């Protein structure tokens, strides 16, 4: 029956309470403990509540979680490949018991849902990483979240929706499964091919999706992710404008666009099956699965996390049970002598095939060079040029890290003056001591508070970078994970340069005007970096500077030369 087939598990599980019950729940919510949802948790909750994650009725219990990790199945036996869990902090978990109700709120404190806590446990995260993602390497974004960001305790239980999360952007393009199924019925679409993407579409993608729908004798749903995808993806505002331009290239009444508020895990084969289940719940009959579908790229040794066909092979193993047809993505190439895109297996030996790699396309965007019209559409290129100005017009952050007394602040001040002298952009210095005084005065020097201080610095720097200014940060920043989070936050918004001021500790001690090292060695000060608290040496710093034989002026000049080589200044 095409688009009218049953949702996964047999029933669309929309979890919002009726209005009168939601009002009652709101009144009693103040009596419950409240958990402020992270962006990823809010995405998961949104798709739980609207039925996209059917047949789930809440965040997974331990029994469901363990069976999903080990067997890709719920306790009921229904196929489900991805753990959907609510991770919380240890302190919050200590105040919650099985049988309690908790309030789930967004970042502004708006009550989105309540949850009946039926289970709480401490998961074996390494085991989860190995079973679900096939690796414990935290260069995998899902493993990184799991090992370095997720709370230590999971809560499981049914959720009851109070009101949907508020989105102010592209409202007409956001659909629940029941709404999209209704649209398909209204249009008379009985077979629908779904295409997921988190990247802009160019001519090759338009051609392959149109061919896929035509060969399946179906209509086409383009359903891009606008929740959380890769950190290096374009912002979704830019992408959606690009999708709207590309939509004009399809024949009328054949294709529709709808946005999906999904937090991707980049989980490769399992993620492909998960994506298919979601599209089945939205009413689709076919799903396009690409090579290395939802793969995160290479591990820290330069090897791919997943093989190119792993996702298609796992999908095929479960295709009958999934009850949604896989459409393997065909590699499209541009044949210059025929002036058209063709599947690579339909080309002839005499054909002249030309291509433009993603890195080369990015370079041309960054440097304002010509993008051939055979590669993309002029309106798409125009949107991407606006989002990716030449590097010398972008904002950037220079992030110093090093021991107390290493020379960070002195070099940072010298660099600031030189950049102000250049005058191409506004410059802001976020020095460690100044930030402690004005932004983080209530924080201690515990590891938790040190990380929070670096998060604050990173947030301010990201806003400066996003608005095309220059941020110079000069904290000690002793912990690698906090530094990595700042890098990941800023990199999608502009340039990021980490400068490790590697001056030896004995030189730093000899410069100590405040006597802090002496107090630390005497045991008067605890948790002092380099003495009784570790400094984790950066592995990815763009520049390493030892100031014992280098003046601040020369050090700043060296940084300027590197910025010039990278194209951020002229």
Label every PLM stretch briefly.
Residues 183, 187, 317-474, 478-509, ...:
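Glycine-rich phosphate-binding loop of ATP-dependent small-molecule kinases
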Residues 1-392:
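Active-site cores that bind ATP or allylic diphosphates and position pyrophosphate for catalysis
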């Amino acid at each position: 029956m095409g688009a009218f087939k049953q949702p996964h598990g047999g029933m669309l599980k929309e979890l919002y309470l009726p209005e009168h019950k939601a009002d009652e729940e709101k009144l009693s919510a103040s009596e419950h403990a409240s958990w402020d949802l992270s962006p990823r948790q809010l995405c998961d909750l949104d798709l739980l509540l609207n039925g996209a994650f059917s047949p789930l009725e809440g965040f997974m219990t331990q029994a469901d979680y363990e069976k999903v990790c080990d067997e890709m199945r719920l306790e009921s036996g229904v196929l489900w490949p991805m753990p959907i869990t609510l991770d919380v902090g240890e302190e919050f978990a200590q105040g919650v018991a099985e049988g309690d109700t908790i309030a789930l709120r967004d970042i502004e404190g708006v009550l989105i849902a309540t949850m009946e806590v039926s289970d709480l446990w401490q998961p074996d995260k390494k085991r989860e990483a190995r079973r679900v993602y096939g690796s414990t390497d935290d260069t995998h974004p899902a493993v990184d979240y799991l090992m370095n960001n997720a709370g230590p305790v999971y809560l499981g239980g049914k959720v009851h929706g109070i009101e949907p999360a508020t989105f102010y952007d592209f409202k007409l393009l956001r659909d629940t499964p029941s709404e999209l199924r209704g649209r398909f019925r209204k249009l008379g679409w009985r077979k629908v091919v779904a295409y997921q993407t988190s990247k802009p579409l160019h001519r090759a993608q338009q051609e392959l999706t149109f061919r896929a729908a035509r060969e399946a004798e179906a209509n086409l749903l383009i359903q891009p992710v606008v929740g959380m995808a890769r950190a290096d993806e374009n912002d979704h505002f830019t992408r959606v404008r690009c999708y709207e331009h590309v939509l004009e290239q399809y024949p009328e009444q054949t294709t529709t666009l709808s946005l999906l508020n999904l937090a991707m895990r980049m989980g490769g084969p399992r993620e492909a099956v998960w994506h298919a289940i979601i599209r089945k719940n939205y009413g689709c009959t076919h799903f396009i699965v690409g090579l290395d579908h939802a793969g995160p790229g290479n591990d820290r040794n330069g090897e791919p996390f997943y093989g190119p066909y792993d996702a298609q092979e796992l999908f095929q193993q479960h295709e009958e049970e999934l009850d949604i047809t896989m459409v393997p993505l065909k590699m499209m190439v541009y044949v210059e002598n025929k002036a058209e895109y063709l599947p690579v297996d339909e080309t002839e030996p005499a054909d002249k095939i030309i291509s433009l790699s993603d890195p080369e396309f990015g370079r041309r965007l960054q440097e304002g060079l010509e993008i051939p019209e055979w590669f993309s559409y002029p309106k798409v290129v125009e949107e991407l040029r606006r989002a990716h100005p030449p590097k010398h017009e972008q904002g950037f952050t220079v992030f110093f890290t090093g021991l107390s007394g290493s020379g960070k602040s002195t070099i940072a001040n010298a660099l600031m003056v030189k950049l102000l002298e250049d005058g191409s952009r506004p410059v802001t210095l976020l020095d460690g001591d100044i930030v402690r005084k004005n932004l983080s005065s209530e924080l201690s020097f515990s590891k938790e508070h040190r990380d929070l201080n670096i998060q604050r610095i990173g947030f301010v720097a990201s806003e400066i970078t996003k608005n095309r200014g220059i941020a110079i940060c000069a904290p000690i920043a002793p912990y690698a994970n906090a530094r990595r989070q700042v890098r990941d936050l800023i990199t999608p918004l502009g340039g990021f340069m980490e400068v490790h001021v590697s001056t030896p500790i004995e030189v730093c001690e000899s410069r100590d005007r405040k006597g802090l090292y002496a107090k630390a060695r005497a045991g008067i000060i605890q948790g002092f970096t380099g003495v009784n608290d570790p400094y984790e040496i950066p592995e990815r710093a763009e520049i390493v500077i030892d100031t014992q034989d280098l003046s601040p002026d020369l050090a700043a000049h060296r940084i300027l030369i590197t910025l010039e080589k990278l194209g951020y200044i002229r």
